[in-house]
A protein has these predicted regions:
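N-terminal Rossmann NAD(P)H-binding glycine-rich loop of SDR-like oxidoreductase domains
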Residues: 4-27
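Conserved Rossmann-fold NAD(P)-dependent oxidoreductase catalytic core, especially the SDR/UDP-sugar
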Residues: 3, 89-134, 160
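Active-site helix of classical SDR
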Residues: 136, 140-143
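NAD(P)H-binding glycine-rich loop region in Rossmannoid oxidoreductase-like domains
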Residues: 45-85, 97
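NAD(P)-dependent short-chain dehydrogenase/reductase
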Residues: 115-124, 149-201
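SDR active-site strand-loop-helix element
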Residues: 10, 35, 60-66, 103-109, ...
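Adenosine-cofactor binding site in Rossmann-like domains, unifying the SAM/SAH pocket
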Residues: 25-50
Length: 201
C-alpha cells in the first residue's frame, strides 16, 4: 500500500478496527474511508454494493462484526449468525466485484474446536465440535474465512484472514454482562482495587 491508497476500514469504531485506524494514520496514510453503522448498514447488500461502487477502495480491512461475550452469544444466537454472515458476505463480494486489491478479514479464536489440543495450531480448524455458547458466531467467522479462501481460489482475489486472539485495549467492551473474558477480568480487578476488595469472583 502506498500512502495515498484508498483504504476502507469496516468497523473502525471497534477495538481492532480503531487500532488499525490509529496505526494507519500514524504511519502517514491519508486516504482512509470510514463509515459508522448508522451511515452504512453492512447487513444490507444493496447499500454495500452502492458504497463500493461509489468509493472504489483499493484495500479493505474487514473488522466489522456483531460481537459480544458468552452471555450475549448464547442468548442472541440467530442474530450473531445472521448479522455476521450478512456483513461478511456483502463486504467480501462487493470487494471482489469492484476489484479491491487486497482484503484482510478478521476471524476469531472461537473458530477452533472446544477440545482442540493446546497450544492450538491452524490445522485444528474444523476437526471437532465448537464451543456451544458461541457456536453461531464461530460458524459465521468460519464462513468468512472460507469465503476469502474461495474467492482467492476461484477469482484470484488477494483476500486473506487473520485470527487475532485474546485482545483487549482502547474501545473494547468492558460491560460485565456482554464483554469477553479478558476485559471482564480487567474490569473486575480494577474495581476490586478501587474498592479495596481482597478477592474477585
Amino acid at each position: 500500500m502506498n500512502k495515498k491508497s484508498k483504504i476502507y476500514i469496516a468497523g473502525h469504531r471497534g477495538m481492532v478496527g480503531s487500532a488499525i485506524h490509529r496505526k494507519l494514520l500514524g504511519m502517514g496514510f491519508t486516504n482512509i474511508i470510514t463509515r459508522t453503522s448508522t451511515e452504512l448498514d453492512l447487513r444490507i447488500q444493496e447499500t454495500v454494493n452502492e458504497f463500493f461502487e461509489m468509493e472504489r477502495p483499493d484495500y479493505v480491512f474487514l473488522a466489522a462484526a456483531k460481537v459480544g461475550g458468552i452471555m450475549a452469544n448464547n442468548l442472541y444466537r440467530a442474530d450473531f449468525l445472521y448479522e455476521n454472515l450478512m456483513i461478511q458476505s456483502n463486504v467480501i463480494h462487493s470487494a471482489y466485484a469492484t476489484g479491491v486489491k487486497k482484503l484482510l478479514f478478521l476471524g476469531s479464536s472461537c473458530i477452533y474446536p472446544k477440545l482442540a489440543p493446546q497450544p492450538m495450531k491452524e490445522e485444528y480448524l474444523l476437526t471437532g465440535l465448537l464451543e456451544h455458547t458461541n457456536e453461531p458466531y464461530a460458524i459465521a467467522k468460519i464462513a468468512g474465512i472460507k469465503m476469502c479462501d474461495a474467492y482467492r481460489a476461484q477469482y484470484g482475489c488477494n483476500f486473506i484472514s487473520v485470527m487475532p486472539t485474546n485482545l483487549y485495549g482502547p474501545n473494547d467492551n468492558y460491560d460485565l454482562q456482554n464483554a469477553h473474558v479478558l476485559p471482564t477480568l480487567i474490569r473486575k480487578f480494577h474495581e476490586a482495587k478501587q474498592n479495596g476488595d481482597p478477592a474477585v469472583t
